[in-house]
């Protein structure tokens, strides 16, 4: 248990700092009435043309999530490519299995029409 002490201390300190940083604004925030202009979106000195908090199409979120997933795939491939001459066949085939799983997922999303913009 002693070998985990630095990790536990780090987690406790991180939690305390996070809670302090979240709580300090509540101590110093003023309770004065706010003006509606302060709550509206600022558009370079002009009156806002419309509501800045409009809804986005769900396809934007889907495309962004797919981008993050495949961007992480590339992030995993860089260290693998650098150490390719040092790993054995198990490392090679495990990364090929990882690539196959992600390719199957990509083909599934493509077949379901997640990438079609209608």
From Swiss-Prot:
Q: Which InterPro entries match?
A: NAD(P)H_OxRDtase_bac/plastid, NADH_UbQ/plastoQ_OxRdtase_su3, NDAH_ubi_oxred_su3_sf
The function of this protein is: Core subunit of the mitochondrial membrane respiratory chain NADH dehydrogenase (Complex I) that is believed to belong to the minimal assembly required for catalysis. Complex I functions in the transfer of electrons from NADH to the respiratory chain. The immediate electron acceptor for the enzyme is believed to be ubiquinone.
Chain ranges passing through the membrane: 9-29, 62-82, 87-107
State the species of origin. Triticum aestivum
Query: According to its UniProt record, which reaction does this protein catalyse?
Result: a ubiquinone + NADH + 5 H(+)(in) = a ubiquinol + NAD(+) + 4 H(+)(out)
One Pfam family assigned to this protein is: Oxidored_q4
Query: Can you list the GO cellular component terms from the UniProt entry?
Result: mitochondrial membrane
Gene3D superfamilies in the record, alphabetically? NADH:ubiquinone/plastoquinone oxidoreductase, chain 3 (1.20.58.1610)
GO: which molecular function terms? NADH dehydrogenase (ubiquinone) activity
Q: What is its EC number?
A: 7.1.1.2
Please report the name of this protein according to its UniProt entry: NADH-ubiquinone oxidoreductase chain 3
- Assigned protein family: Belongs to the complex I subunit 3 family.
